[in-house]
């Protein structure tokens, strides 16, 4: 009999991606953040997600007042620049959860056949991601929805830079009410520092940002929260060390 863990990992994207995309789109239309974490708890408790190993990470940006500022394409390259007036960022890693309010800012989405770059820049948050994937043609049209599996990723914020060879799914949903949902699911937390691969992972406080004091007024039923002065990659790195 074949290894059940290998079978679960093989068919995990087929199980998660369609369900995840439909549920996130439905949740995005609902203003109750508690439903989001209920969905995350359901997914994390499924047999496929219960395989021993690093936990799954969920990052969700919910933005409003979104407008397209610039869009241009080349035969093998596409770039879109968005502006938004505000929103929120939700995270769930293992038993921890967090939701921060975001001020207005800009989004840059660059797409090639093998790499997709995502940069979110506002006064309360800056994060940049690069996702490596197989040939995938993005159709960036208004009111579009897409889910793109990736094989590895690189991320940077004002306090840290990480890369990981674990895969996941990037989803972008744009609605006709000037709103957007960007979700990132990472199937594990085995991460490395590009600038130093020989030394042990530093303690989390070395990656703590004192740059911002975000509001944490998004409702959540979870009792545990990340500290308010951590950046996205700092949180991922901290939980990777404890995985």
UniProtKB/Swiss-Prot annotation:
The keyword Lipid metabolism does not apply. It comes from Varicella-zoster virus (strain Oka vaccine). InterPro entries: Herpes_UL4. Signal peptide: none annotated. Residues 193-226 are annotated as: Disordered. One of its GO terms (cellular component) is host cell nucleus. Keywords: Host nucleus. Residues 205-219 have a biased composition (Polar residues). Belongs to the alphaherpesvirinae HHV-1 UL4 family. It is found in: Host nucleus. It comes from the Viruses. This is Nuclear protein UL4 homolog.
């Amino acid at each position: 009999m074949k290894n059940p863990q290998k079978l679960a990992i093989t068919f995990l994207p087929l199980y998660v991606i369609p369900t995840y995309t439909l549920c996130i789109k439905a949740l995005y239309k609902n203003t109750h953040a508690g439903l989001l974490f209920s969905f995350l708890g359901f997914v994390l408790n499924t047999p496929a997600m219960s395989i021993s190993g690093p936990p799954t990470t969920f990052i969700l940006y919910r933005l409003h007042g979104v407008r397209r500022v610039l869009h241009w394409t080349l035969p093998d390259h596409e770039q879109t620049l968005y502006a938004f007036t505000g929103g929120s960022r939700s995270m769930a890693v293992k038993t921890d959860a967090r939701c921060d309010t975001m001020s207005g800012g800009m989004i840059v989405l660059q797409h090639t056949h093998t790499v997709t770059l995502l940069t979110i820049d506002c006064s309360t948050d800056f994060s940049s991601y690069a996702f490596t994937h197989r040939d995938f043609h993005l159709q960036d049209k208004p009111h579009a929805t897409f889910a793109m599996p990736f094989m590895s990723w690189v991320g940077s914020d004002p306090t840290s830079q990480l890369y990981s060879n674990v895969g996941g799914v990037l989803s972008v949903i744009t609605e006709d009410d000037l709103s957007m949902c960007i979700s990132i699911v990472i199937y594990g937390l085995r991460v490395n520092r590009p600038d130093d691969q020989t030394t042990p992972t530093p303690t989390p406080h070395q990656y703590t940002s004192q740059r911002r004091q975000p509001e944490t007024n998004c409702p959540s039923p979870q009792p545990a929260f990340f500290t308010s002065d951590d950046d996205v990659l700092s949180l991922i790195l901290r939980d990777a060390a404890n995985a």
